[in-house]
């Protein structure tokens, strides 16, 4: 007579393991872009355009911050202009009083 040892039964998984993924997260939006429109009146120190790199160049009465943000140096009217054939710039022209 053959004796079976039933205490040595092994149960294998009937479903695959869940695994993991390296995705599933996203960075916060940086709120880049134009902060003042063409023709809008701004005061000195106002932020005109937030950017990474020089997508738009500073023109008349416009400064560039350390993070490439463009800001008005004087109070005036904002104008987005072409600079040459393929570049853009933003200028602020003082209001004549």
UniProtKB/Swiss-Prot annotation:
Biological process (GO), any one: translation
The keyword Aminoacyl-tRNA synthetase is assigned to this record: no
Keyword line: Ribonucleoprotein, Ribosomal protein
InterPro entries: Ribosomal_bL27 (IPR001684), Ribosomal_bL27_CS (IPR018261)
Post-translational modifications: The N-terminus is cleaved by ribosomal processing cysteine protease Prp.
Region (Disordered): 13-38
Record GO terms (molecular function): structural constituent of ribosome
Top-level taxon in the UniProt lineage: Bacteria
Pro-piece positions: 1-12
Family per similarity comment: Belongs to the bacterial ribosomal protein bL27 family.
HAMAP family on file: Ribosomal_bL27 (MF_00539)
UniProt-recorded name of the protein: Large ribosomal subunit protein bL27
Recorded name of the encoding gene: rpmA
């Amino acid at each position: 007579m053959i004796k079976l040892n039933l205490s040595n039964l092994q149960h294998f998984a009937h479903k695959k393991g869940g695994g993991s993924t390296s995705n599933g997260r996203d960075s916060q939006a940086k709120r880049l872009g134009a902060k003042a429109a063409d023709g809008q009146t701004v005061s000195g120190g106002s932020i005109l355009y937030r950017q990474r790199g020089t997508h738009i160049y500073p023109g008349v009465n416009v400064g560039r911050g350390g993070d490439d943000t463009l800001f008005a140096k004087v109070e005036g009217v904002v104008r987005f202009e072409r600079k040459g054939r393929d570049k853009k710039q933003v200028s602020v022209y003082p209001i004549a009083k």
